[in-house]
């Protein structure tokens, strides 16, 4: 359960980071 939740958080974090880089690039 924790691993699945962590993977989900990492995916969301990656997407948010990519969006932020795109917005500020």
From Swiss-Prot:
Taken from the UniProt entry, a GO cellular component term is:
extracellular region
**GO BP: any one term:** defense response to bacterium
Name the source's superkingdom. Answer: Eukaryota
Compartmental location: Secreted; Target cell membrane
Query: A GO molecular-function term, please?
Result: toxin activity
Q: Which UniProt keywords apply?
A: Antibiotic, Antimicrobial, Membrane, Secreted, Target cell membrane, Target membrane, Toxin
Expression across tissues: Expressed by the venom gland.
Write out the similarity annotation.
Belongs to the ponericin-L family.
Q: What does this protein do?
A: Membrane-perturbating peptide with multiple activities. It is insecticidal, since it induces reversible paralysis in insects (L.cuprina) after 1 hour, but fails to kill them. It shows moderate antibacterial activity against some Gram-positive and Gram-negative bacteria. It is also antiparasitic, since it moderately inhibits the larval development of the major pathogenic nematode of ruminants (H.contortus, IC(50)=23.2 uM), but fails to reduce the motility of adult males of the other nematode B.malayi.
Which named protein is this? M-poneritoxin-Nc2a
Origin species: Neoponera commutata
């Amino acid at each position: 359960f924790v691993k699945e939740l962590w993977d989900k958080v990492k995916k969301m974090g990656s997407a948010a980071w990519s969006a932020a880089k795109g917005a500020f690039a």
